[in-house]
């Protein structure tokens, strides 16, 4: 396997192939096949997202994949932002369609033509819905599994509110939801206010959740958008307030994608393979029976341990594959990122114990089956240590710069600097180091002199990005 530090790009591609997460050999570039193990992980991520939004009174929906051209063109700024990425359907069978149809690049245009039918009075608000679907974008840049693809596994939440203040409260709720999701995935991140030229098309402002990959490049792993009344005015989404006056709703959205899985792979993995957070590991503990004279009894004992683990809601399996040595199985499951390995031989059976090996630090611990509940604690500790390691990696590769001439030129890092917010100064940094402005750090009132022009600026982040 490639060395992660020396060649992250090759390591990343190789581990996706070895762990059988997806197969990129499908006939259409950028439309990859989800393989069983990768899909199981993604479904567990989806479950975390669902649990968090369901707890905040969101309702799940499912909209059609096709959108008419007129639906898309209702909001000019929105369609302008996607016009070069849209897949168009122009024929039905052998007949040319009278109305061109698009595969959804996102679902504002589809949903907001329905909102006026659902929203009539203040009693219908807030409206909070979401869906987890595929969206389609004709990506012309270099495609990369889970990072830049043409068919995107996508979560999108959409809300409508009585006024801007209530929409802003929703934005705060999104951040609480995101914090919980990121904690479960053990991911570090900054919250960056995107510059106006990089905000979501049609939004008043965009907040992005950006993490740092081991390559030194930034990866956007989530966004929330405040729309105000921009979309409501174009799609005529109005309601009668408590006084009987007709008003436009204010709207927000929240988007996440399979890039969450990309971040988990890249940030947590090592030269042995994946290291999965326990929260999304399809197998949290793998039981490896050790062959010997009493192997049938060892298998029976392993089955007993499996039942005990399932009783405490640990996702566990027994690797009873024949013609494979224990050593091969150890390496195979380590490569797949399973948090804990449980070795069971005649010695463990005779002493009513199990030997537990951590994927993260390789430490071995022999515990009595009376202490089997400790497996849950070990999984929690696994995730805590993953989180600490991930935040440490990002912090160690974040550099504060107060002079444009001090930008490190020999490696990619996350650059923190004061910036006035102008496009000119952002372009100057890009020419110097080939970095782009991720935006100003959200909710920080820290101010200083812009690293380029010396005018007043706010603390901001810059990086090469995927």
Curated annotation (Swiss-Prot):
Top-level EC class as recorded in UniProt: ligase
CDD domains: ProRS_core_arch_euk
Matching Gene3D superfamilies: Anticodon-binding domain (3.40.50.800), Bira Bifunctional Protein, Domain 2 (3.30.930.10), C-terminal domain of ProRS (3.30.110.30)
PROSITE patterns the record matches: AA_TRNA_LIGASE_II (PS50862)
GO annotations of cellular component type: aminoacyl-tRNA synthetase multienzyme complex; cytoplasm
Localization, UniProt: Cytoplasm
GO molecular function ontology, one term from the record: proline-tRNA ligase activity
Pfam family, one: tRNA-synt_2b
Gene Ontology biological-process entries: prolyl-tRNA aminoacylation
Origin superkingdom: Archaea
Keyword Ligase (UniProt): yes
SUPFAM superfamilies in alphabetical order: C-terminal domain of ProRS, Class II aaRS ABD-related, Class II aaRS and biotin synthetases
EC number: 6.1.1.15
UniProt KW keywords: Aminoacyl-tRNA synthetase, ATP-binding, Cytoplasm, Ligase, Nucleotide-binding, Protein biosynthesis
Catalytic activity: tRNA(Pro) + L-proline + ATP = L-prolyl-tRNA(Pro) + AMP + diphosphate
Domain remarks in the Swiss-Prot or TrEMBL record: Consists of three domains: the N-terminal catalytic domain, the anticodon-binding domain and the C-terminal extension.
Function: Catalyzes the attachment of proline to tRNA(Pro) in a two-step reaction: proline is first activated by ATP to form Pro-AMP and then transferred to the acceptor end of tRNA(Pro).
PANTHER family: BIFUNCTIONAL GLUTAMATE_PROLINE--TRNA LIGASE, PROLYL-TRNA SYNTHETASE
Record-stated family: Belongs to the class-II aminoacyl-tRNA synthetase family. ProS type 3 subfamily.
Subunit and partners: Homodimer.
Alphabetized HAMAP family for the sequence: Pro_tRNA_synth_type3 (MF_01571)
The name this protein goes by in its record: Proline--tRNA ligase
């Amino acid at each position: 396997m490639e060395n992660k530090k020396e060649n992250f790009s090759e390591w990343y591609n190789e581990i996706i192939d070895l762990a059988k997460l997806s197969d990129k050999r499908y006939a259409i570039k950028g439309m990859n096949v989800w393989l069983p193990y990768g899909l199981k992980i993604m479904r567990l991520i989806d479950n975390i997202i669902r649990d968090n939004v369901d707890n905040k009174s969101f309702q799940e929906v499912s909209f059609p994949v096709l959108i008419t051209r007129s639906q898309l063109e209702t909001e000019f700024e929105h369609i302008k932002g996607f016009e070069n990425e849209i897949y168009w359907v122009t024929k039905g069978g052998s007949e040319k369609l009278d109305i061109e149809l698009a595969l959804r690049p996102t679902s504002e245009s589809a949903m907001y033509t329905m909102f006026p039918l659902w929203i009539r009075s203040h009693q219908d608000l807030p409206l909070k819905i979401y869906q987890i679907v595929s969206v389609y974008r004709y990506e012309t840049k270099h495609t990369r599994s889970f990072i830049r693809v043409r068919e995107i596994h996508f979560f999108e939440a959409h809300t409508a509110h009585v006024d801007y203040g209530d929409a802003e409260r929703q934005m705060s709720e999104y951040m609480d939801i995101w914090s919980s999701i990121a904690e479960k995935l053990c991911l570090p991140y900054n919250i960056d206010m995107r510059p106006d030229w990089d905000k979501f098309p049609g939004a008043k402002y965009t907040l992005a959740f950006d993490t740092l990959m081991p390559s030194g490049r930034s990866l956007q792993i989530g966004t929330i958008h405040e729309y105000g009344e921009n979309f409501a005015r174009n799609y005529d989404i109005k309601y009668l307030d408590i006084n009987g006056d007709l008003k436009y709703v204010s709207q927000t959205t929240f988007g996440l994608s399979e890039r969450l899985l990309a971040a988990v792979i890249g940030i947590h993995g090592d030269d042995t393979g994946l290291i999965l957070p326990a929260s999304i590991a399809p197998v949290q503990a793998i039981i490896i029976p050790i062959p010997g004279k009493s192997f049938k009894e060892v298998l029976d004992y392993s089955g007993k341990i499996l039942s005990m683990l399932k009783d405490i809601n640990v996702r566990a399996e027994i690797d009873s594959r024949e013609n494979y040595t224990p050593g091969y199985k150890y390496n195979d499951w380590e490569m797949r990122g399973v948090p804990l390995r449980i070795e069971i031989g005649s010695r463990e059976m005779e002493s009513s114990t199990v030997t537990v090996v951590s994927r993260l630090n390789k430490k071995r611990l022999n515990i009595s089956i009376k202490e089997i509940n400790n497996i849950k604690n070990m999984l929690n500790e696994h995730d805590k240590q993953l989180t600490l390691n991930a935040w440490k990696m990002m912090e160690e590769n974040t550099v504060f710069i107060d002079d444009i001439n001090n930008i490190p030129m020999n490696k990619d890092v996350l650059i923190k600097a004061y910036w006035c917010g102008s496009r000119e100064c952002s372009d100057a940094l890009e020419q110097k180091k080939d970095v782009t402005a991720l935006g100003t750090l959200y909710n920080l009132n820290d101010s200083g002199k812009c690293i380029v022009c010396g005018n007043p600026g706010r603390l901001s982040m810059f990086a090469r990005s995927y």
